[in-house]
Amino acid sequence: YNQAAEVAFRDFLRNKYHNNIKELNDAWGTAFWSEVYSSFDEITLPKTAQMFMNHHQILDYRRFAARQTNDFLNEQCLLIKKYAHNQWVTTNYIPNYDEGHIGGSPDLDFVSYTRYMVYGDNEGIGRRGYRVGNPLRIAFANDFFRPVQGTYGVMELQPGQVNWGSIN
């Protein structure tokens, strides 16, 4: 992370917790492991090298990252619409179901996603899984994206077995 990201995360937290560090400490349960903060300036972005990370901090970080992603998508969308008045605008999401930013960009005309059936795991269906993948992935993705905005699209799809499946 860079300094601007840390400052933006702290600003996000100040706004969320009404510029009240005690409110943040209470919400994060920092007294339990002697992690009490006396200032928002002491807070850093979660680092994977940390031995133990506060789960509440990670959750707030994910919310912050989702907001940053959506702000960026909305900014791009509005810029495109400024110059291309009759153009639909979408983005190519990947169905990572634990990502919080999906559906958070109201300026997009509709959401779309990419789904590749074969990408290196077989999910317990044997050698065939490495060749053709799991067909349920497309069903899960459709069920996930359908309620986001109603209209959705599949931007990219691997339609079948890759002709070099025995190699990769």
Regions of interest found by a model, annotated:
Residues 114-127, 152-168:
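Aromatic/acidic polysaccharide-binding cleft in carbohydrate-active enzymes
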